[in-house]
Regions:
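Winged helix-turn-helix DNA-binding recognition segment
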Residues: 3-5, 22, 60-124
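Generic beta-structure capping elements
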Residues: 56, 125-127
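Short, amphipathic alpha-helical interaction segments positioned at domain boundaries
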Residues: 128-132
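Short recognition helix of helix-turn-helix/winged-helix DNA-binding domains
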Residues: 1-83
Length: 132
């Protein structure tokens, strides 16, 4: 069988595989994670789950803009409770806290605790100034 036959749609369907065609490649929404987190110091040695969490935080910034969630001097913040992080990443409480702490240590996040059982205000920080 010629190599080109492997990529034919009929063959794909016989093997319970299906390819994306033309406009179908844009059917889904995606989280964006900055490439510099994988290529530049001091980020490239960070836990991959912390990098993913940073991408989730950046995604939630869109909701902050729509909701008008800005604090002093117009700084954008997000509400992203530990229970939601645990659910989204499929991890335990301690792991979620560890990932947030790792982002803080890398200079990618600042947390402002509110107390009284309220979720912390999370400020995702720009990464450009942290690249060595």
């Amino acid at each position: 069988m010629p190599a080109s036959a492997i990529f034919m749609p009929q063959r794909a369907r016989r093997n319970n595989m299906d390819y994306f065609y033309e406009h179908e490649s844009e059917l889904f929404t995606f989280y964006r994670v900055p490439k510099v987190l994988f290529t530049e110091e001091p980020f490239k040695n960070m836990n991959c789950e912390a990098k993913l969490l940073y991408g989730l935080l950046l995604d939630k910034m869109g909701l902050s803009r729509k909701s008008g969630w800005f604090y002093k001097q117009g700084r954008a913040f997000v509400y992203y409770g530990i229970s939601h992080i645990m659910e989204d990443l499929g991890c335990a409480h301690n792991k979620a806290e560890k990932l947030l702490s790792e982002l803080e240590q890398a200079g990618l996040l600042r947390r402002k605790r509110q107390g009284l059982g309220k979720p912390s205000m999370l400020y995702p920080l720009k990464f450009e100034n942290r690249i060595s």
